[in-house]
C-alpha cells in the first residue's frame, strides 16, 4: 500500500510542489535557478500538443456517421462557452465591487514604473478581434504545427477530418495510419508525464524564489478575493451545471486530481491538455466531442481568466482612484467578452489580454498594470485550475446534449477511483 502511494503521480507531484516551495523560500537564489526545469517540462508537453489534437480530431470526425453531428457539437459548444464565460465575467465584476480590495490604496499612476509592463503593452497592441480571427487561419499547414498554434491546428484537423470522411473507403488506410500514430503519441505522453514532478518542483521553486512569499502579503487582499471567487464559481456555478447534468463536481475534481496538481505546479492548463483528452474519453464522452470541445475551450472557455480580467481591471481602478460608473463597467464587460477569447491556456496570456483590454477601454491607467505584475504569477494557479475544471465540465455537458455521452460509463468511472489508473496506462 505504501509503495502504491509513493509511486502515484498525485503523491510525487504534491511532494515536488512542497519541496519547491521550501527551496524557493529558504534558498531563493537557488530556487530561481530552477526555472529551466519547469520550462523544460512545459516545452516537452507543447512539443506533442499539435499532433495529439490533429490525431484526436481527425479520427473523431472521420469516424462519425453524420457530419451534421459535428456542426451541432460545435454550435452547442460555442453557445455554452459564451454563456458560462459571461457568467464568470459578471461574478468577477460583482465580487470585486462588493469587497473592494483596491479601495484605500490611493496609488498615483504617475509614480508607478511603467517600464515593467512595456513588453506586455506592446504585445497587447496586436490583440484585436479581426487579428484574432485571421490568426486562426495558418499561413501554412507546416507553420501551424511548427508554432504549435492550437486553433490553427484545430482548423486544419477539422477540414482534414471532413475530407477524410467524404472520400469514404478510399481513406480507410489513412485513417488507420493516423489512429496508430495517435497511440504512439500517447505512449510518448506517458513517458513525458513521468517528469511531471520535476517540472512542478522547478516551476514552484522559481516562483517562490523570485517573488518570495512576502510579496503575497503586499497585495494579499486581491489574491484572497480572486481565490475565493474562483472557488465560488467552481462549486456554485460549475457545481450547479454538473448537478443538472447528472454528475457531482466533487467526484469530477477527484477524477482529475493528478492533472490539477500538475497545473498547480506549472500554472499552465495547457500542460495537461493531452491527458485531459484521454481522461474525458475514458469518462464516456465520444472522441469527436472531446477532440472539438477541449482544444477549442482552451481559447474560448477560460472561466478562471474571465474572473481574473474583470477583478484585475476594477482593482486597478479602485487602487488608482479612477472612477468607473455603471455604463463604463458594462463597456468593460463587453470588451472583455471579446478580448478574453484571445487568451490561450498558457502562463502570462491573461496579463497580455488585460493590457489589451485596458488599452481598448481607454479610461483606465495602463501604468496601473505594474501594481499586479508582481502577484500575477501567484494568481495564475487559480486561473489555470478554474480553466481546467471549466473545460472538463463543458465537455461532459456538450457531449450529453449531443447524445455523445455514455452516462453509465461516466457514473461507473466517477464512482471507481481505480478507473483513473486504467486511464494512466492508455497507449
UniProtKB/Swiss-Prot annotation:
Gene3D superfamilies: Sodium:dicarboxylate symporter
Keyword Transmembrane tagged: yes
GO cellular component, one term: plasma membrane
Pfam families: SDF
InterPro entries recorded: C4_dicarb_transport, Na-dicarboxylate_symporter, Na-dicarboxylate_symporter_CS, Na:dicarbo_symporter_sf
One Gene Ontology term from the biological process aspect of the record: L-aspartate transmembrane transport
rRNA processing in keyword set: no
Chief location of this protein within or outside the cell: membrane
Subcellular location: Cell inner membrane
Membrane topology listed for this record: Multi-pass membrane protein
Coiled coil: none
Transmembrane segments: 5-25, 44-64, 76-96, 142-162, 184-206, 222-242, 307-327, 330-350, 352-372
Record-level Gene Ontology MF annotations: fumarate transmembrane transporter activity; malate:proton symporter activity; succinate transmembrane transporter activity
Keywords of the record: Cell inner membrane, Cell membrane, Membrane, Symport, Transmembrane, Transmembrane helix, Transport
Family indicated by similarity: Belongs to the dicarboxylate/amino acid:cation symporter (DAACS) (TC 2.A.23) family.
Function: Responsible for the transport of dicarboxylates such as succinate, fumarate, and malate from the periplasm across the membrane.
The protein's name: C4-dicarboxylate transport protein
Lineage: Bacteria, Pseudomonadati, Pseudomonadota, Gammaproteobacteria, Aeromonadales
Gene it is expressed from: dctA
